[in-house]
Amino acid sequence: MENLTPKKIVEELDKFIIGQESAKKAVAIALRNRFRRQLLPKELRDEILPKNILMIGPTGVGKTEIARRLARLVNAPFVKVEASKFTEVGYVGRDVESIIRDLTEVAMNMVKQEHTERVQEKARQLAEERVLDILLPQPRYTRDMNEAEERTRYKETREKLRKQLREGILDERYIEIDLKEKVVPFGIISNVAMEEIEINLKEMLGSFLPEKVKRKKVKIPEAIQLFTQEEANKLIDMEKVTKEAIERVEQTGIVFIDEIDKIASRGSSYGPDVSREGVQRDLLPIVEGSTVTTKYGPVKTDHILFIAAGAFHVAKPSDLIPELQGRFPIRVELNSLGKEEFVRILTEPDNALIKQYIALLATEDVYLEFTQDGIEEIADISQQVNEKTENIGARRLHTVMEKLLEDISFNASELKGQKITIDAKFVREKLSEIIKSEDLSRYIL
C-alpha cells in the first residue's frame, strides 16, 4: 500500500477503465487517505472518518468497475449491493445490516484462503503421509520376526511408494478414504430476512451432532487434494482468522451501493416514497458508523468506505434525505461514452473486448484480425444504437460484438486454421440491416 500513491492508483485503474479521470482521482485520494490514517497516533486515527463517495452517471460508464478494481488493487473486502433490493426493517426482504454480514463473509473467505496458502505445503505433506498409510499400512510385528529388519524393509518400501506417488505413477490407482463431515439432518424453510437465524441454528445443531465419517473411493490425486483441505483446516487457527477478518472489514472494507437513486424519494408522504425513505433511514446508521452483529462477532462500520452510485435520471441527489447526503461529501460526475471512448475501450485496456474474442477463438485455431476501420465501425454502430434506443454505455459493445461474431463462433469447428479479417465492410454486412430497423436494433442489439 505504501507504494500506491494516488497517481499510481490512477495508472492501475487506467489499465482497465477508459476516461472518467475525476472519478478515478476521487477514489485514489480516498484510498490513499486510508493509508495515511494508519500512520497516525491511535487517538487521532479514530477521529478521522472515511470520505464516502457519490458517483453520478448513466449506466455502463464504469462506476462499478472503478470500485471493483480499487478493492482488488489493495486486496480489500468488497461487496456490491443494489439499494433497490433492500426493504425497511420489519418488512419481507433483506435488511441493510445484511450488507455488513456479507462483507464480513467475504473477508472471512479472503483471510482463510491466505492462511490456507501459508500452511498448504505442510498440509500436503500430511495428506501424502495419510495416502501412504492407506497404500502401505503399518505392519504388525510378531515375536518370530526380526523387528529391526522389518522396520527397515517397511521404510524402504514406503520411500519407493512416495517416489512413485510424486512422479505420478500411481495417479490412476483408486483407494478408499474416510472423510469427516458434520450433517444437520433437516433444512429450515425461511425467507431472506431469516437467513442469519438459519445459519446460526444450523451451526449450533451441527456442534451437538457427532461427526459422520463418509467412505469414498477416489483416485489418488483427488485423495491427496481432499486430505490436504482437511489437514489445512486442522492447521488453521480459526480464532486468529476471525479476528483478522473483522479487523480487515473495519479498517479496509469497501461497500459499493448501486442504484441509490432508486431509493431517493420525491417528497410524497404516502405510497412507495415512504418505504424508500425508510430504507435511507436504515442505511444512515451503517454509513454514519454503528456496530452490526454478525455470526463472527460485532463489526464496527465507522471506517468502512461507502461508494454509492446512481444514474439520477428522474431523481436528483438532493432528493436523498439530508442526513444521508451529508454522509457522501465527495461527489463525482461520470461522463457518457461516445465513439472515441468506445474505440479505446475495444483496444486499450488489459482486458479489452477484442483481445478477449481473439483469445477465445484462438483456442479453436480460428484467428481473428481486427482492422482499425473495422474497430471504428463497431464503435460507431454502438454509439448509433445507444442514441436510437436506450443508452447503456459500454455494455452496448458486448451485444454488438456478440452479434457480429455470432456465425464465426457457431461455425468455429469448421473454420480451423483460418484467418478472418474483421474490417468495416465485414461489420457493415453483418449489422447494417439491424441498424436500419429501429425495432430490430431495439430487440437484437
Curated annotation (Swiss-Prot):
GO molecular function: ATP binding; ATP hydrolysis activity; peptidase activity; proteasome-activating activity
Keywords, ordered alphabetically: ATP-binding, Chaperone, Cytoplasm, Nucleotide-binding, Stress response
Nucleotide-binding in keyword set: yes
Main subcellular localisation: cytoplasm
Entry annotated with the keyword Cytoplasm: yes
GO (cellular component) term, any one: HslUV protease complex
Similarity field: Belongs to the ClpX chaperone family. HslU subfamily.
Name assigned to this protein: ATP-dependent protease ATPase subunit HslU
Organism per entry: Thermodesulfovibrio yellowstonii (strain ATCC 51303 / DSM 11347 / YP87)
